[in-house]
């Protein structure tokens, strides 16, 4: 598909891997030849890292495209996409690079493949600077499926920083079109639940301490709901290396989902990890939006592709979300508006409505 190359400045706005994920996925979907320059230009280690490289190679393989300049440390790539193919595709970061970020770049593409896809993704399942796989399963999946597609995700092995070694298998069936979504009614919080985990040599007491500290923190603000956080010792044969962490999810009467999460680090008290996750959840419940700060940017590409007008209500719009909107407008020509929420209960809050007129992308194979 040789045509006019679309030029993307990889150094603007969020200036990191997200620009690559959004622009290469849209390039693949829309058949747009792409050049991305100044990749991660402002980062302490500029250029492609292993997880970005494996994401790029995966998109190339999904469509049998042509990729140049793709090596560790490279600050410029060119990508020429071809037709999206279903079937089995493997990506391995060979590090603790996040499998969830690999999913972010590949999922929109395979929805428009000719046949079902199986994505074998290897790396970190519960990694820093990325959604944990539990977030992807507990929050992203049920909300993203409102766009009218389904996927399942089988966690074979969990992998942690610094070794990685995790593997998930994602199965996705293609769709003709994506439905628009309207998530503007928050409802009231009806359930709070979660899991605190330890893996490898770490004792279960660490998970129990994280869970107990999180519950105490939430109770100070939300007194009338039972908070159920399960402490879990990951099975030895299903986890590689040592790790710990927690995710807590709040569900509302209208089916909205919010989360707070945190990972354990050497030398950091378990209580502190639990409290950090609890405080993140509480902050995400205060703004009155229908999605948390980590879901908002993940929905933008689907809103851009959907057949109709989508609306989501958010707290303050993150830089990641602003970046995703910028590139969805530049590449897909979707039209977004971001307005302060005009509802009375939001008057004193930092609450916004993101609206998008999607392009109604149709799967040419179905």
From Swiss-Prot:
Alphabetized InterPro entries for the sequence: RNA3'-term_phos_cycl_insert, RNA3'_phos_cyclase_dom, RNA3'_phos_cyclase_dom_sf, RNA3'_term_phos_cyc, RNA3'_term_phos_cyc_type_1, RNA3'_term_phos_cycl-like_CS, RNA3'P_cycl/enolpyr_Trfase_a/b, RPTC_insert
Reaction it catalyzes: a 3'-end 3'-phospho-ribonucleotide-RNA + ATP = a 3'-end 2',3'-cyclophospho-ribonucleotide-RNA + AMP + diphosphate
Active-site residues annotated for this sequence: 320
Cited CDD domains: RNA_Cyclase_Class_II (cd00874)
GO biological process per UniProt: negative regulation of optical nerve axon regeneration; RNA processing
SUPFAM superfamilies: EPT/RTPC-like, RNA 3'-terminal phosphate cyclase, RPTC, insert domain
Localization per record: Nucleus, Nucleoplasm
Record carries keyword Ligase: yes
EC number: 6.5.1.4
Molecular functions (GO terms): ATP binding; RNA-3'-phosphate cyclase activity
Tissue-specificity statement: Detected in retinal ganglion cells (RGCs) (at protein level).
UniProt GO cellular component terms: nucleoplasm
Keywords, ordered alphabetically: ATP-binding, Ligase, Nucleotide-binding, Nucleus
Binding residue positions for ATP: 104, 131, 294, 297-298, 320
Domain of life of the organism encoding this protein: Eukaryota
Stored PANTHER family: RNA 3' TERMINAL PHOSPHATE CYCLASE, RNA 3'-TERMINAL PHOSPHATE CYCLASE
Protein's job: Catalyzes the conversion of 3'-phosphate to a 2',3'-cyclic phosphodiester at the end of RNA. The mechanism of action of the enzyme occurs in 3 steps: (A) adenylation of the enzyme by ATP; (B) transfer of adenylate to an RNA-N3'P to produce RNA-N3'PP5'A; (C) and attack of the adjacent 2'-hydroxyl on the 3'-phosphorus in the diester linkage to produce the cyclic end product. Likely functions in some aspects of cellular RNA processing. Function plays an important role in regulating axon regeneration by inhibiting central nervous system (CNS) axon regeneration following optic nerve injury.
Family that this chain belongs to: Belongs to the RNA 3'-terminal cyclase family. Type 1 subfamily.
Name of the protein: RNA 3'-terminal phosphate cyclase
């Amino acid at each position: 598909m040789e045509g006019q190359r679309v030029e993307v400045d990889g150094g603007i706005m969020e200036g990191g891997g997200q620009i690559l994920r959004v622009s290469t996925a849209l390039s693949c979907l829309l058949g747009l030849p792409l050049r991305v320059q100044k990749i991660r230009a402002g980062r302490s280690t500029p250029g492609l890292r292993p997880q970005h490289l494996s994401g790029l190679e995966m998109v190339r393989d999904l469509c049998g495209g042509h990729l140049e300049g793709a090596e560790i440390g490279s600050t410029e790539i060119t990508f020429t996409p071809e037709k999206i193919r279903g079937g089995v595709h493997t990506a391995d970061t060979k590090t603790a690079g996040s499998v969830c970020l690999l999913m972010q770049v590949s999922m929109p593409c395979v929805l428009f493949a000719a046949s079902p896809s199986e994505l074998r993704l290897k790396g970190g399942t519960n990694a820093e600077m990325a959604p944990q796989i539990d977030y992807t399963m507990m929050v992203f999946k049920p909300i993203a499926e409102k766009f009218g597609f389904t996927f399942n995700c089988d966690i074979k092995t969990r992998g942690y920083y610094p070794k990685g070694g995790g593997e998930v298998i994602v199965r996705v069936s293609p769709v003709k079109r994506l439905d628009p979504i309207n998530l503007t009614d928050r409802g009231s919080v009806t359930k709070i639940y979660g899991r605190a985990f330890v893996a490898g040599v770490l004792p279960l007491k660490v998970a129990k301490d994280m869970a107990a500290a999180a519950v105490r923190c939430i109770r100070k603000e939300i007194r009338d709901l039972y908070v159920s956080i399960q402490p879990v010792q990951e099975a030895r044969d299903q986890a590689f290396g040592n790790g710990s962490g927690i995710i807590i999810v709040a569900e509302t009467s209208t089916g909205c989902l919010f989360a707070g999460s945190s990972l354990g680090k050497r030398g950091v008290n378990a209580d502190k990890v639990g409290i950090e996750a609890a405080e993140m959840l509480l902050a995400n419940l205060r703004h009155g939006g229908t999605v948390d700060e980590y879901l908002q940017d993940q929905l933008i590409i689907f809103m851009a592709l959907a057949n109709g007008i989508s609306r989501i209500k958010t707290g303050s719009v993150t830089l990641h979300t602003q970046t995703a909107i910028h590139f969805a407008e530049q590449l897909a020509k979707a039209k977004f508006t971001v307005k302060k929420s005009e509802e009375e209960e939001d008057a004193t809050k930092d609450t916004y409505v993101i609206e998008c007129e999607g392009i109604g992308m149709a799967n040419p194979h179905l």
